[in-house]
Regions:
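ABC-family P-loop ATPase nucleotide-binding domains
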Residues: 3, 53, 58-149
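ABC ATPase nucleotide-binding domain signature region
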Residues: 16-79
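Conserved H-loop
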Residues: 59, 165-173
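Conserved beta-strand-loop-alpha-helix hinge in the C-terminal portion
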Residues: 146, 184-203
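Conserved catalytic loops of ABC-family nucleotide-binding domains
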Residues: 150-162
Length: 203
């Protein structure tokens, strides 16, 4: 059978301290690329080298355990990343506003509640680079506003690699651009160059 490569022989260097926006059409492989960079999904060939502390894709719940409570999940993640479990737990409990559900297993959570916990876990860690799949909304406008504010605070001392099909979102957060198309990733020297090339694809 002929194999279909989502990412075909992709090779790229992401500069430290630079926020990179990766544009691509729906289904181009943007989310797959982020999962590979973050370590949530291994590449079929080659390797990913990181010399800074990189987050998992924000709002990606793959590292959360359905049988554990919200509190237990946050303490587990804190230990894995060398953070203070008590401080991590306190931040997540206050930030998510899950109430009694914070002490209930994740299998009882709605999708929005799981997203809240995943957001909080991401914000509780001081990463050098955050991986962002769009600026994910939770369906709760008030919480989404709080999340964006917390995210902007983190970006004062960190960079991001963001994937999106929305050029306005990329322009809001990023300074350098790239395009993923046909399984290939092309880096550009400036964001304007990337946006111009992306506009050609979408025309």
């Amino acid at each position: 059978l002929e194999s279909n490569h989502v990412l075909d022989d992709v090779s790229a260097t992401f500069p430290t301290g630079v926020s990179v926006g990766i544009l691509g059409l729906n289904g181009a492989g943007k989310s797959t690329l982020l999962r590979v960079i973050g370590g949530a999904e291994p590449p079929d060939r080659g390797s990913v080298y990181k010399d800074v502390r990189v987050s998992w894709p924000i709002a990606f719940g793959g590292g959360l355990h359905a049988s554990l409570t919200g509190r237990e999940n946050t303490r587990f993640i804190a230990r894995v990343y060398g953070e203070s479990p008590a401080k991590f737990e306190r931040f997540a409990e206050e930030f998510t506003e899950l109430g009694r559900y914070f002490d209930m297993p994740l299998r009882t959570y709605s999708t929005g509640m799981r997203s809240r916990l995943a957001f909080a876990a991401s914000m509780a860690c001081n990463f050098d680079c955050y991986l962002v799949d769009e600026v994910t909304a939770t369906g709760d406008k008030r919480f989404s506003s709080r999340y964006r504010q917390a995210f902007k605070e983190r970006l004062k001392a960190a960079s991001i690699i963001m994937v999106s099909h929305n050029s306005q979102t990329i322009r809001q957060f990023c300074t350098v651009g790239a395009i993923i198309h046909g399984g290939k990733l092309k880096m550009f020297g400036t964001l304007d160059q990337a946006l111009a090339a992306y506009n050609q694809i979408t025309m």
